[in-house]
Regions:
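A solvent-exposed interaction/effector surface
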Residues: 2-5, 15-204
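Repetitive helical segments and hydrophobic/amphipathic motifs
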Residues: 11-12
Length: 204
């Protein structure tokens, strides 16, 4: 019952943040329809690794991450929630990047990340009390992103991931071939209002 109540509060919190939450700092270098080339500043994430299917991974990791930003840290400090929540397969073994298609929907390890506010540097980020939560600094980087609505199903993600891959190929953009998935809304958001993204790190 306690777990259900906490999850309910967390989802209410996310609902409020979906509209007002601070987004991680970046500049749009180029926009072409629903595709953008972005330059991201250095940022800090709190991440949890879970064993699950892609669709289950965020739910399994959310509680630990939400408790961390709610004060379950050494400093007992509450941290503002930002957008998006990102998701990345661990098996791809690359640093967690900014904005939670995968060809396989089977179980595997996934990293789910919350981004710290833009003014919170790595050295002042509170230390987690939960060993499952890890703090990581992400260097400044250039990313290609495609934005889309509707539900974050494997098919919908795969469709837009392929569109972004084709765009980068057509425009001779070198990239690291491992995606990051980014989600901005709580589950009950109407499908036509949802914001999802697939991102790839650009090689410079």
């Amino acid at each position: 019952m306690k777990h259900i109540f906490l999850s309910f509060l967390a989802l209410i919190f996310m609902s409020g943040c979906a509209v007002t939450a601070e987004e991680i700092s970046h500049n749009v270098i180029k926009k072409d329809g629903n595709i953008e080339i972005r330059q991201y500043d250095e940022t800090v994430i709190a991440k949890v690794t879970v064993e699950a299917t892609r669709r289950e991974a965020t739910s399994k990791a959310f509680r630990s991450l939400f408790k961390f930003i709610s004060g379950d840290n050494v400093a007992k400090q509450e941290i503002s929630m930002t957008a998006p929540v990102s998701q990345q397969p661990v098996s791809q073994k690359i640093p967690m990047t900014t904005p939670v298609a995968q060809e396989s929907a089977g179980e595997g390890q996934w990293q789910i990340a919350f981004y710290m506010p833009n003014d919170m540097e790595f050295d002042i980020t509170p230390k987690p009390t939960n060993d499952n939560v890890t703090i990581e600094r992400i260097p400044a980087q250039k990313m290609a992103a495609i934005r889309f609505s509707n539900r974050s199903t494997d098919d919908n993600i795969a469709k837009h991931e392929q569109e972004l891959l084709q765009y980068m190929t057509d425009n001779n953009i070198d990239y690291i071939p491992e995606p990051t998935y980014a989600f901005y809304n709580p589950p009950w958001t109407p499908w036509f209002m949802r914001r999802n993204e697939v991102l790839f790190k650009i090689v410079e």
